[in-house]
Amino acid sequence: MSYSLGPGPLPPIIRKLIIANVVAFLVTSVTPGIMLWFGLRPADVFGRLHLWQPVTYMFLHGGLFHLLFNMLALWMFGVELERMWGSRYFLRYYFVTGVGAAATTLVLSLVPMAGGEQLYYSLTVGASGAVYGLLLAYGLYFPDRPIYLYLIFPIPAKYFVMIVGAISFFSSLGGASGVAHTAHLGGLLAGYLYLKGPRTRLMAEFAYRFEKWQINRSRRRFDVYTGGRGSDRDKRIH
């Protein structure tokens, strides 16, 4: 009889992401000024064209607890997804949700009703946007899998996603709190659109039709034509 704790050993992409985040944290601990250069700040993206920030901010964290929480969540929710999707699709989804979270922050920084002026000059760091995207995917693919709130109360994953989504939405309307709720909301939204949006259905239909065309083409190509009964001379394989 064997026992296991958690989703299991780290697959390759998650292992590399954790290493990259830890290395970035150690570097910023020695040279904290890097945060201002590689963190997400809408004023710098729009005003100074620091176009790398919507990607690089995902690898920076404001403190040890922030880093540990995100890496733990990456492990908890990401391992099964990477095994199911494969490393390439998982990595693409991770960056889509992380950059989508940054895009949401950038757009809302231009909306006065969403606290845009304050958000415009604020600095956002952390992998939370991508992690929230993974949480959404986990809830969609494993809706009845229990997630333990405060390590005590089991909640089905689909309801847990609804709860954190509602918290992120209403918190994003409530002004400054020191937490990037707009990025959390953006990660959830980007993940949903990527997995369930019109583009996904269109691409699935295209992939199905392309695969069907390839199968039919292969059948025509390898059909065996018989020139006469009992004779091998006129048989051809295309």
PLM regions: where:
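C-terminal transmembrane module of polytopic alpha-helical membrane proteins
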Residues: 1-13, 20-22, 168-238
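Transmembrane helix-loop-helix
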Residues: 3, 13, 54-138, 169, ...
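Alpha-helical transmembrane segments of multi-pass membrane proteins
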Residues: 24-36
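Structural signal for the C-terminal ends of transmembrane alpha-helices
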Residues: 30, 76, 80, 139-144, ...
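Extracytosolic (periplasmic/ER-lumenal) interhelical loops and adjacent juxtamembrane/interface segments
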Residues: 34-59
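Alpha-helical transmembrane bundle and helix-membrane interface signal
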Residues: 83, 141-153, 199-206
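Select subsegments of transmembrane alpha-helices in polytopic membrane proteins
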Residues: 155-160
